[in-house]
Structures are given as C-alpha cells and as structure tokens.
Amino acid sequence: MKRLAVWFAVFGGLLTTPVWAALKPGDAAPDFTAQAAVGGKDFTFSLSDALKRGPVVLYFYPKSFTRGCTIEAHEFAEAAASFAEAGATLIGMSKDPIEVQRDFSTQECRDKFPVAADPSLSVIHAYDALRVGVTASGETVSDRISYVIAPEGTVLYSYVDPKPDKHIENTLAVVRQWHEQHKN
C-alpha cells in the first residue's frame, strides 16, 4: 500500500501536466462560435465578429470557481477597461456548462467581460488547450493558456502557465503594443 502511495505521488502528478503545445504566433486562429455569458446573461460569441472590432484576448482556464481560475478572473476584471482602451475584446473559456458560466460571469468576472462554455471541448481541442490526462477528480479540463489574436485571424501571442500570475500582464502588454502600431 505504501508503494502505491509513493507511486501515485511521483507519477500521479504527470496526469495533469500541460501539453505545452499551444498554437504559436503566426498560426491561424480557429474560428468558432460558442455560448457565452456576461453579467449573467447568455449570448452567442463569434470570434470572427469580435475580430472585426480589433484583437481578441482568448484565455482558457481549467474550471470556474476554483482558486486559480477565480484569481485570474478577478485580475482580468480589474484590467478589463485597459483591454477595451487598447481596442481588444476579452473572453475566457472553460469546459464548464453555460449554467455555471452565467454565475461565474457575475460573481468572479464582475460583469466586466464574458466567459464562454465549451462542454464538448471542441474549441479547447482546436486551440491545443486540452490538458493531457485528467485531474485528480477524474475530469478532463483545459490548460491555462492565453492567446492574443490579431484582427486578421492569426495568433499574435500565446502564453502557457498553470499559474494565473502573468497572463493578464503579458496579454495586456501585447494588446497595447498592437494598438500603438495600428493607430490611425
């Protein structure tokens, strides 16, 4: 029994290691539409429609209402006005169903930006954001990956880190740089 516990401690963590195979700058960003919620209200988010207004920051997170994902949502909410000033649309996405995203959009995103539901994992797969293996609770979830997508539909930037710390800072810097280069 002790050996089994040691084996799980050593190798069990490998089940949730990220794939690190995110799309790279210059790659085409797969177009998608998804059910989303902002301020507790449902709507259909279309990447192609959002790109008509400027760059899109699309961030994937493992699960709504978990510690790291809540921290990340709070930080994106605090920076939402800065993203908008730079002309960017901000949207988060996880595999959680729309019923969960409705509450998350109000409670944790503070009505500042939408979160999309991808229970089929189709968008998560298309963006190489699926975590390899399953969580300790047996769920398949996305990795924590942030993308900045240019209006022409290509990836400007991708950032993969299981910690939420730098996702907001890094994507906002890229969006601001894009905005400076595309004034007028």
PLM features per residue range, with description:
Residues 5-16:
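Bacterial N-terminal signal peptides
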Residues 20-184:
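Chalcogenol-based redox active-site neighborhoods
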